[in-house]
């Protein structure tokens, strides 16, 4: 079974996914990292930031190749983005060609209270993130739901929304494990 697990920056996805991987024994594959590894093997880039500078056509090819690699995995948790917020609007994190190759059984969205997410972002000096307000974070979480519904219509996969309550990542992880096992 291949599961796609997403969440906005600061929702606690990495913490929850570490627990899910440990409890389920299913490997976590970061989609962006896999794209980078494919690009590096092909001699296209030396670091992950260079991917953004490749032509759109090359990036689409990398998306397809990474998706095909994931599609060959019997069990995998795919760590990626449901939608990507840009200055020009929201982009799909899983365009049609990626959805088709990954062939996920379930899309999981990890959510948290937008005020808590904002506080986590503000208190994380290790990341350079855009300064988004609570309303903007709320909107992005809502958009992730809309994108997940659209992906579900196309793929037939189920959609599960999991709350990551402050200080309780184990509860969120347990709920996810029940869905993906």
From Swiss-Prot:
Stretches that traverse the bilayer: none
InterPro entries: Adenylate_kinase_AdkA, P-loop_NTPase
Class in the EC hierarchy, top level: transferase
Chief location bin: cytoplasm
Reactions catalysed: AMP + ATP = 2 ADP
GO molecular function, one term: ATP binding
Stored Gene3D superfamilies: P-loop containing nucleotide triphosphate hydrolases
Top-level taxon of the source organism: Archaea
Residue sites binding ATP per the record: 7-15
Localisation per UniProt entry: Cytoplasm
Family, as annotated: Belongs to the archaeal adenylate kinase family.
The name this protein goes by in its record: Adenylate kinase
């Amino acid at each position: 079974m291949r599961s796609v697990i997403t969440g906005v920056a600061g929702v606690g996805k990495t913490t929850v996914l570490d627990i899910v991987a440990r409890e389920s024994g299913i490997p976590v594959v970061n989609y962006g990292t896999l794209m980078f590894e494919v690009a590096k093997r092909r001699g296209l880039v030396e670091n992950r930031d260079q991917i953004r500078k490749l032509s759109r056509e090359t990036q689409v090819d990398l998306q397809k190749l990474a998706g095909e690699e994931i599609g060959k995995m019997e069990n995998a948790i795919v760590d990626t983005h449901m939608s990507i917020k840009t200055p020009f609007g929201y982009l799909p994190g899983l365009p049609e060609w990626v959805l088709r190759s990954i062939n996920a059984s379930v899309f999981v969205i990890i959510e948290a209270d937008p005020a808590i997410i904002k506080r986590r972002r503000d208190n994380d000096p290790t990341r350079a993130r855009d300064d988004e307000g609570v309303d903007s974070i709320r909107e992005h979480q809502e958009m992730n739901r809309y994108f997940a519904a659209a992906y579900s219509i196309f793929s037939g996969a189920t959609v599960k929304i999991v709350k990551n309550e402050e200080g309780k990542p184990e509860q969120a992880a347990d709920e996810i494990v029940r869905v993906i096992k």
